[in-house]
Each structure stands twice: as C-alpha cells, then as structure tokens.
Amino acid sequence: MNLTKFNLLFSSVLFSFALAIYFFIIVPSDESARLWTRYSAHLSFLYLIAAYSLSILKDTLNLDAINNLAINRRYFGLSFSISHSVHLVVLIYFFYTSNENPGIVSIIGGGLGYLLMYAMTLTSTDAMVKRIGTKTWKILHTIGINYLVIVFFYTFAGSMVGGSLYSIYTVYVLAILIIWTLKIVKFAKS
C-alpha cells in the first residue's frame, strides 16, 4: 500500500479509535480513560515528529525513502491535528470522569498549543498560503510546530525524570534532541 494523503489522514482516525476500542472494549479497566489519554498523546507525537523532522532529514540524509515521505509532510501535520483533536476529547473525558483537574500550566500551555495547531491546520492549503502570504504562513508554522515540539519535549522529559530512564519517553526526548541538533547545525552552516 502506498503512503498517500488519504492513507495518512485515515490512519490518524483509525488508530485514534482503535485505541478507544482497545481500552474500553477489549481490555476495559478503571484506568481505561487514563491509558487512552496517554496513548492518544503517543500517537499524536508520532505524526508530529514526522512532520517536524522530515525536512531536516531530507536535507541531511537525502534518502529516497525520506524524500518520498517528505512529499506528504503537510499530511503528517494534518494527521497530527486529527489525532491530537481526538486526544483533546479524550483529555476532557478523562478529567470529567476522574474528577481530577488539570493544572493552570497545562490549561494555558496546552490551550496555546491547540490554538496554534488549529491555526496551522486552517492555513495548510495552498489557497490559504496565498491569502495570508508566504512570510506570515512561514512565521505561523515555524512558531506553531516548534512550540508544540517544545511542549511534548517538556512533558516527555518530565515523565522520563519521574520514571525510568529506560522508557519510551527517553527515546522521544533523544529523537527531539537529535532533530534539534541537526536543525542547529544546518542553521549554523547557512
């Protein structure tokens, strides 16, 4: 199966709902909402890190496989938006059913992240790029994606420090650090 725009977007919907089916029908428990929240964030991160890293990996490695993935970079971003919108619904459900409250930092920091994500989503067409101008579009998308990656980095680094060094969070943090290093090196050379 070829990686197409439709396949990417459909996968974000399919995997988001597959998580719900798994946690609530296949292996239901008192922790289902918490686990669904956690794993929907993991799913979102995979789409985000792909969208974030493809251009620098294409420039650095120039491999056919990466070049082919980079063609659909916009759709990795839109798939992130879909899966992270499901994550937002899951978070609301979790806080509603658990009677826990999110912290003010999570509300403000996460809220800003969602605003930026939706602004990027709404401007992810060629027509919108023309309408708002390439320079404005580039500023919005550069600030937006970097902010989102920083939020994930902060969250994962905190989970890594609070848990085991041998966790998936360590892999995520290292992946972000590697991509940042490649971007800094490219910037320094230009």
Locate each region found by the language model:
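Membrane-embedded alpha-helical bundles that constitute the cytochrome b-like, heme-associated redox core
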Residues: 1-190
